[in-house]
């Protein structure tokens, strides 16, 4: 591995080391109890492995996922990318940055979680976002480049102190959702959806590919290998942090009365665990410092997402100006952020339960076609069937329409019913492709 590989690896790490995602591992650790290891490893699979795989697969075509998804279907490519940008933008990810910032700063410092306090905070937060995005400058990037190492140092200090403070404690008791190693795995797997990093990787993979090209690597195979090695570096670093935070959360003593109180006050348990770690480890100053760093890091993330989503929509629908998109997406994010962190997370679950299976299936199909060439129909069949099953399963799970056959699907009780279907339909797709003579084989464009 050369110097550039390490640089790109830590660039990848910085992209996925989001302040907003730090709340999930401790919460999973607390809830998983004796099933911690299968839960956290499954979380790492969807929260780290899939995002990095997504970036690596994005390097297969010179146009990134725009080119790769177009091979499946141009209409599917546009619709799916729009859904992804809305998901990682104004519908869920951007509002979550604001509500997380609120619960990491105002709630522990002012000891309030009121709707009025949240409203005032989000007004100020999104006015700053609006100003910085309408008048984009390098300032946000510079602040972000300073905050990432500062946040990393703070988290590492918390981890070391957390092991000292909680490492000798017995593990927590698993909640009702965790009844076996396999249920722990499935819970961790679907909890990893909440990071939204795998679908973000589809949107931003070209940033990494261009960073690799900037080092002088231009051959397609070398770009793929360089991105793969950089991805391994980022994965190891992220796994250490997520597993460590999860392990500490797994050994924190939180009474049922406290959990009931947090739930009654609509306060997120993950943010409570993080602020408690900081407070116990470093006192009031540590709690305040962590909150401020996380809030600023979330702010820079929000700015980056608003700019990226606005630029994307302006590119595909140019009649509306970039600034109008910024205003629209900032306003939507402001409205949704005022529902509170738990509500934002809850609202995202049905959408992510549809988007993630489609995204995972698409990424794996693109990767498979790289090594086992085929025709578009081989990808179209599994993507279409997985999309239909995921939508119907979500409708059934939410109780909107009862579809009894959904419960009989393999792995439905673990929210993985789409996976065997993806495997079977991929095999069928390849068989059909071998019989179809009119379609040309998929060829990913290289430099």
Curated annotation (Swiss-Prot):
InterPro entries registered for this protein in UniProt: Brnchd-chn_aa_trnsp_Livcs
Annotated keywords: Amino-acid transport, Cell membrane, Membrane, Transmembrane, Transmembrane helix, Transport
A UniProt-annotated Pfam family: Branch_AA_trans
Membrane-spanning parts: 6-26, 40-60, 74-94, 116-136, 143-163, 192-212, 228-248, 289-309, 324-344, 349-369, 381-401, 416-436
Membrane topology field: Multi-pass membrane protein
Keyword Transcription regulation among UniProt keywords: no
Protein name per UniProt: Putative branched-chain amino acid carrier protein SSP1343
